[in-house]
């Protein structure tokens, strides 16, 4: 009885709620030493929050946002609908038209707050991406082949991958594959035999993933056919909303209308059954500023958009917001940032933060527009990005590393990609656990080691509970590593006893990772780089 009364008092003290017309306003004051993560899935603010920010409406803008926050003091904030939020530095002000939003006490740690919120509001449903996405790279040839990649170009690209000594994986078909944008039918002009091309790529060892968007060309036959049937998102003045994206300016389907959703879902099912397509890369980023005009609103639109992958475990999303369950697909964060050293630092931080917000299978990629002038990019940036990608749940490759002119960097890139398969079994284990428990695959150190001074550590992370990853994020081959309590073993068998802060040098651009020694034993030691440079023999490092 005493504990319940105390909790009730705290809620009143730290969350004052008042009804203003149709809006609910809640102020959440920070507890002593409390740090918060949330709201911005990518490209928003450094986390945990430090600097104040002005009022932000989560239902508007292009950035990827979520009405979910967690704190290192065991509290969380969650809403099924977007809200507006302001941060003063010592309190949050949340305004919502959908109902009261408050801070809920779920325990004492970041992990407890995250897991309680997940299981209460969007529990794991037992679904997860295909293991094949974890063990082989995903190649996106948009940069080299352009928007309208042809059958010949795609098959030639697959041959280049294999000829260069890279493993087969998943090949993404850019969004211009349709006969008319919005038809969801292959172009006979680009593909003489679409099903035959898919079979040929399968024979080479590749899986095929189609880029799918909600867009419809404003001057095409699909738009003219459906314009009078309220199939598209419209502005309040009844004019059709036109969004800018890679294909120009286009209308887009209103998936919150049941008949529209069923139409698109049926087309995607037909692409799989009629042509042998393995999965889809869903991209609705250009539509984000206008989703608030959808019949059901922005949250309902993104929820229905996320449901298009139901029944297919071979999918990626660039933007999504499912609220009925834990995300069960690969979430591909595309950062709108120049491809440079700062991009790498932001990618590492955003990737770990996204794992704290209900996206356990998150990867980070640069936008293609940021890769337009590759000749000016330091070759080591490519190398470091591939190293970082190699420890993500899915290894996405958005450029052709076999075309890098620096021979040493090119050789290192190929070794990294080929050695990715060594992590496959461990990732399968993590994904199998995550789909049942909701545990993130990549974990913030504060999540795994609470109250040990890691709240501000955003350039290291845990891969499950076994591996500490300290990615190299600049041109140097060494970096400062913060070791938690315990014994940590590197690829050479060297041990580090934590807590410890020390500089570690990576030999020959090896990925810096360390396995936690449990009861004097090392279970995995599946490193990305442990091939002997002298004779090419694979050596397993012992303890």
Locate the predicted segments by residue:
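Short, intrinsically disordered, low-complexity terminal segments
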Residues: 2-3, 19, 503, 523
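Short, Lys/Arg-enriched, disordered terminal segments
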Residues: 1-6, 22, 538-543
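C-terminal beta-strand-rich structural cap/linker in extracellular carbohydrate-active enzymes
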Residues: 498-537, 542-543
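Leucine-biased recognition of intrinsically disordered, low-complexity hydrophobic segments
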Residues: 7, 19-20, 512, 528
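Sec-dependent N-terminal signal peptides
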Residues: 2-17
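Catalytic-domain carbohydrate-binding cleft regions of carbohydrate-active enzymes
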Residues: 23-509, 529-531
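A generic signature of intrinsically disordered, low-complexity regions enriched in glycine/proline
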Residues: 6, 258, 287, 494, ...
